[in-house]
Amino acid sequence: MKFRTINEANVSGKRVLVRVDFNVPMSQGKVCDNTRLERHKETICALQKRGAKIILLSHCSRPRGKIVPELSLRPVAKALETIMGQQIFFVEECIGAPVQTAVEALQEGQILLLENLRFYKEEEDNNADFAEALAQQGDLYVNDAFSVSHRAHASVEAITHYLPSYAGMALQRELQALEKGLDNPKKPVTAIVGGAKVSSKLFVLNHLVTKVDYLVIGGGMANNFLMAQGHNVGKSLCEPMLMDMVKDVIEKARESHCTLVLPVDAVVGLQCETGTPHHHCMIEAIPDEGMILDIGEHSIARINTVIDASATLVWNGPLGVFEVSPFDHGTIAVARYAAARSQKGHCVSIAGGGDTVFALNHAGVADDFTYLSTAGGAFLEWMEGKTLPGVLALMQDLKN
């Protein structure tokens, strides 16, 4: 995967449009979590040191082409001032005369943040005219947002047709980490895929069985595989209408010599809530009225044995109903074991997706994985083997 990076760009005195992801939680006009702002600091500082005039582009939430005052990026500008230690200029537009005036006034090293891109319907339509209008404000373009690179949007894809385009440092670091996960990994490779519904990850599973040596399936989605193997799963979450597709994954795994690792025991209760009575049982003994809420100790031990045999681990999704104690135990136990292996240098560990990040933070080991991606949809599409539009655009720009 080859594309130009900002290290190759002459940015001195240039207007540099930087696509960032400042889609952050806000409450009462203030940013609640600066994590995503911090991720882009390295790229912004690198451009500053080399004399660039920096114009930041971002979306926030889903205003669907309408101006929604509570989704304005003005509070983000204030939060960014604290992080950067300098004034951040802000314009309540993305294109037009006010933006042009603000850009013309920028000095080298100064930063301008434009308004929420998704206040414009044309952004999500990948509209060429809107992309060209954005491009007129800059001399070159930098994509620093892996988390939006699965979107063929105007500020991600179409804009690259109008400006020389480069990868920022956060994007470059993410792609390098992911390459170690599935594209060019050390073997054996294990993928852990969990979550509630198998319907949301069938494409991921179909791709992974052709790429990994072991595929661990947990969470509610594992119930479908257990049912496909003839097990009773009681009242557990399941999607019977997808049974043929699940059986196809099982067959494809067999043909690809990928070992499927499914729960062999479980923690079972009658309801999915804190304080509900629960007990341990083997998969063969799930009661008709029971719900599988977490993996059991035998399953944890089996997964840890697979991790012991792995040089690369890719993880997306929890292994039980981790939001409800004590059904977070399986996810926490495996996460801590994987983190310890990674810290000792025994495996490269890569995890991603919103629930996964939350779960690993909950387990206290998020910082112990080799790489943790905050991207949700982009991470899943990478796991599906798709080439992301934002990354493809940078690769094509290099060819041109």
From Swiss-Prot:
PROSITE patterns: PGLYCERATE_KINASE. One of its GO terms (molecular function) is ADP binding. Pathway: Carbohydrate degradation; glycolysis; pyruvate from D-glyceraldehyde 3-phosphate: step 2/5. Pfam families: PGK (PF00162). InterPro entries: Phosphoglycerate_kinase, Phosphoglycerate_kinase_CS, Phosphoglycerate_kinase_N, Phosphoglycerate_kinase_sf. ATP binds at residues 201, 323, 353-356. Its main location: cytoplasm. GO terms for cellular component: cytosol. GO terms for biological process: gluconeogenesis; glycolytic process. Gene3D superfamilies: Phosphoglycerate kinase, N-terminal domain (3.40.50.1260). Its EC number is 2.7.2.3. Monomer. PANTHER family: PHOSPHOGLYCERATE KINASE (PTHR11406), PHOSPHOGLYCERATE KINASE 1, CHLOROPLASTIC-RELATED (PTHR11406:SF23). Belongs to the phosphoglycerate kinase family. This is Phosphoglycerate kinase. The gene is pgk.
